[in-house]
Amino acid sequence: MSDMRLIVAGAGGRMGRALTRAIAESKGAVLAGALEAPGSEMLGKDAGVLAGLPANGIKLSADLWAMSKEADGILDFTVPAATIANVAIAAERGIVHVIGTTGLSGSDNAVIKSVTNRAVVVQSGNMSLGVNLLAAVVKRVAKALDQSFDIEIVETHHRMKIDAPSGTALMLGQAAAAGRGISLDEHADRGRDGITGARKPGNIGFASLRGGTAAGDHSVSFLGPFERLTLSHQAEDRMLFAHGALKAALWAHGKKPGHYSMADVLGLADI
């Protein structure tokens, strides 16, 4: 099989540059296009140079329709509005869409799922093996411990991150809620301030820290009456997520239309 031809969305950003480097280092994939927002000062610049690599002749462009004509997939870690715009084009072109964008609303996710009867989408709040293993463990622990154990999720990210809680924190919250057999939407405490009253039994709490250059730290604590258990993961470099996204794209190439997750990619769906 020939190399998979991939487009990097948000190619001028930090994650986009990491994705470009991951593709350059890979076996089995080549860069086919570099997408950037209309009006960006990055348009026209060489994607390789922006990523700290030799020039590769791929210029940043805002025209996804044109560049996707000869592509097999798109790696998308952008913002919700951009991702939703990309969904329709990727589905129309019949290319794999790997989505790592966070901050998506319920209606955004509904749009994404609406194309998966005819398109291949891999979507995850986190593309790393460690975090996906953590989510599997969190689900099991939440199921094993009763409601006398309160669940709290704490995440730390760099000062430039624009959404909170992080997609990974919400992913871990969904795992905990699934273990408890409850709806996260109905049992999430996303912020506490002032006189909040006693903690509501069964809820899942979130706290978000922002500062420095942290690539992503997450912990899930189960706090019981006589003991507490904390499970955690620390990301050392965002290349971790770039390599995970590339793995997802290569795995999805040739798959039947559907809505897949990193748990599917990593063989963790049944854990």
Curated annotation (Swiss-Prot):
A GO MF term: NAD binding
Cellular component per GO, a single term: cytosol
Alphabetical UniProt keywords: Amino-acid biosynthesis, Cytoplasm, Diaminopimelate biosynthesis, Lysine biosynthesis, NAD, NADP, Oxidoreductase
Organism, scientific name: Bradyrhizobium diazoefficiens (strain JCM 10833 / BCRC 13528 / IAM 13628 / NBRC 14792 / USDA 110)
First-listed, main subcellular location of the protein, grouped into a coarse class: cytoplasm
PROSITE patterns linked to this entry: DAPB (PS01298)
Name this protein carries in UniProt: 4-hydroxy-tetrahydrodipicolinate reductase
Subcellular location: Cytoplasm
Catalytic activity field: (S)-2,3,4,5-tetrahydrodipicolinate + NAD(+) + H2O = (2S,4S)-4-hydroxy-2,3,4,5-tetrahydrodipicolinate + NADH + H(+); (S)-2,3,4,5-tetrahydrodipicolinate + NADP(+) + H2O = (2S,4S)-4-hydroxy-2,3,4,5-tetrahydrodipicolinate + NADPH + H(+)
Record-stated family: Belongs to the DapB family.
Positions with a binding annotation for (S)-2,3,4,5-tetrahydrodipicolinate: H158, G167, T168
Catalytic residues of the enzyme: H157 (proton donor/acceptor), K161 (proton donor)
Gene: dapB
EC number annotated for this UniProt entry: 1.17.1.8
Residues involved in NAD(+) binding: G10, A11, G12, G13, R14, M15, E36, G100, T101, T102, S124, G125, N126, M127
Enzyme class: oxidoreductase
Amino-acid biosynthesis recorded as keyword: yes
SUPFAM superfamilies with a match to the protein in the record: Glyceraldehyde-3-phosphate dehydrogenase-like, C-terminal domain (SSF55347), NAD(P)-binding Rossmann-fold domains (SSF51735)
Entries under InterPro entries matching the protein: DapB_C, DapB_N, DapB_N_CS, DHDPR_bac, NAD(P)-bd_dom_sf
